[in-house]
């Protein structure tokens, strides 16, 4: 549990905000120096997501997606805009969202909203999104705030909509990264939080072909 590794919740959030403010608004910056894995990540995410967009009568719609912890829009540009009519982005770092407007280019016109907000304080509009994509950002929320955020996301899904979490998984327990002020949870902890948010796990998949030295990365589809 995050309560065991986070001594001061307020400082946990403020330190992360300060950390991201000094990160360059580039793909390499978004990926902590691992910009070269971006295509591997996006291609796997596309396959994972398309199984829900292609299903029969219960298939997920393609009207609007929400990119959480969007940064400069790496995922919006390469995964979401090609598949959805419109996308909203939310990130705590204003400079990233400003840079996104340049980075996204012409297709960026289909980004409806750029929300500058931490996810612990963000409430997505009810009944608005077919897909809510939450990647490499859940570690910046406490367990309680993550469960509460997922509940709010559940309420903002359109019929047959899904939430996707894609993130690092620890081998065991919860590990604090003091540099960027985030935590890495193991699979059981993440599944428990998902369950406590009243969500069902539709699919779970481990990302392949990543460098050996980084955490295992898993995707979860939820509803």
UniProtKB/Swiss-Prot annotation:
Protein name according to UniProt: N-terminal Xaa-Pro-Lys N-methyltransferase 1
InterPro entries: MeTrfase_NTM1 (IPR008576), SAM-dependent_MTases_sf (IPR029063)
UniProt-listed CDD domains: AdoMet_MTases
Residues with N-acetylthreonine modification: 2
Name of the gene: NTMT1
GO CC annotation, single: cytoplasm
Biological process (GO), any one: N-terminal peptidyl-serine trimethylation
UniProt organism field: Homo sapiens
Residues that, per the record, bind S-adenosyl-L-methionine: 69, 74, 91-93, 119-120, 135
Keyword Transmembrane helix listed: no
